[in-house]
Regions:
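Bacterial Sec-dependent N-terminal signal peptides
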Residues: 1-28
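Membrane-proximal, proline-rich intrinsically disordered regions
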Residues: 19-66, 236, 256-258
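Proline-centered turn/helix-capping motifs that create local helix->coil transitions or kinks
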Residues: 21, 58-59, 148-157, 195, ...
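Short, surface-exposed recognition loops and adjoining beta-strand edges that mediate ligand/DNA contacts
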Residues: 34, 60-78, 158-160, 196-290
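Conserved, well-structured interaction surfaces
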Residues: 39-48, 52, 56, 77-152, ...
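Elongated scaffold/linker segments in the mid-to-C-terminal portions of large proteins
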Residues: 41, 47, 80-88, 92-95, ...
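Structural transition elements
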Residues: 167-178, 228
Length: 365
């Protein structure tokens, strides 16, 4: 009996030990903040998520800007976008909620707070690289707040990452002035360390990540919105008068205009949100397919408003030799979505070259 009891006791001890270990294991898709920020790769991963969430903001940017301003319209007026078009938007509608922008802000806040702590854990994470990462975080936060303040004027001002339930989730709105001052302060802080890069490895990264040029442009745009025109001109001149070899420059040859649309990331570009449908299925939300007015009303897509379509026709007539605004097969009359590509999608946003007016971009890159 004593022998049996000893065996049972040992078995129980093993079970309790296993149970304790099992309870300490975190879910595979969850990590606590203290366990995450260990290396430079962790910082890069959060920054990448910030850019990814910024790409997810594009449909909101179109809805709040082009759609609300009647540059584009939607034929189905019963949808959330249709209600925005009819000035019938409600706070409960996902199409008018700002949560995706605050996801970008949250990623940026996390990098700003925790990236400096990584230097104590990763000997290869030098201060220069950390400061470079901070400039990108400042840019992402500033750009997100600029979109928010231009559309809502007063929004909650969040500068700390949400890491636990102790953080408040019902924050009062801050004034437009406070938001704009934060953006300008962020840009100044990013530029003060001289860590903002002029280029990254690869064209897509140079145009798709925050560079010194993107920070100048963000500051100029923010000052313009704040009606601080002299400072706006100052930062615009930093771009226009730059002499660095890899600076953004106006195209010297008019015939190169198409490079801005395909393949994109041209020398004239300062910052572009990157899409890669081929390798990463990132085409969702891309604004590449916008139909002209008169397109089949059964499609679930944007179309240019009638005045915008007429303006495109006028420009096409005036500059026919340049074919700047030509659509597929020279038609401005939209047809059913089912017949794509034999329809009137604006060619320069979906074509593949100036000379070849029948080549179609089959992906939304």
């Amino acid at each position: 009996m004593k022998k049996i009891f000893t065996i049972l006791l040992l078995s129980g001890s093993l079970l309790m030990s296993g149970c304790s270990d099992w309870l300490d294991i975190l879910p595979k898709d969850k990590q606590s903040t203290d366990m995450y920020w260990e290396s430079s790769e962790d910082v890069e991963a959060i920054l990448a998520q910030g850019y990814s969430r910024l790409r997810a903001c594009v449909p909101y940017i179109i809805n709040w800007g082009e759609l609300r301003g009647s540059s584009v319209i939607v034929p189905n007026r019963g949808t959330g976008t249709g209600l925005i078009q009819n000035f019938q938007a409600l706070p409960s509608m996902t199409t008018v909620q700002w949560g995706t922008f605050y996801q970008v802000i949250g990623m940026a806040n996390a990098v700003l707070k925790y990236a400096p702590t990584v230097m104590d854990k990763d000997a290869s994470y030098y201060e220069s690289r950390m400061n470079s990462h901070l400039t990108e975080a400042y840019f992402l936060r500033g750009l997100s707040y600029l979109y928010l303040v231009r559309n809502f004027r007063e929004v909650p001002l969040i500068t700390e990452p949400y890491v636990d339930d102790a953080m408040p989730n019902d924050v009062a709105k801050s004034s437009e002035t406070e938001i704009l001052e934060l953006i300008k302060s962020d840009v100044r802080a990013a530029l003060a360390t001289n860590a903002a890069k002029e280029t990254f490895d690869g064209t897509w990264a140079t145009k798709g990540r925050a560079t010194k040029w993107a920070l100048y442009a963000l500051m100029a745009e923010t000052c313009l919105w704040a009606e601080e025109y002299e400072e706006c001109v100052t930062y615009a001149d930093y771009l226009i008068n730059a002499t660095a070899a890899m600076r953004p420059v106006f195209m010297s040859t008019p015939g190169q205009w198409f490079n801005m649309f395909y393949p994109g990331n041209s020398n004239e570009s300062i910052f572009e949100i990157q899409y890669d449908e081929t390798n990463y299925a990132q085409g969702s939300g891309s604004p590449s397919k916008v139909f002209p007015y008169g397109t089949d009303v059964t499609i679930d897509s944007y179309m240019y408003s009638e005045p915008m379509t007429l303006r495109l026709i006028e420009e096409y007539t005036q500059h026919r030799g340049d074919e700047i605004n030509r659509t597929y097969y020279g038609s401005f009359a939209g047809t059913a979505y089912a017949s794509y590509p034999d329809n009137g999608i604006i060619w320069k946003y979906s074509g593949m070259g100036v000379a070849d007016r029948e080549a179609v971009r089959t992906i939304q890159d």
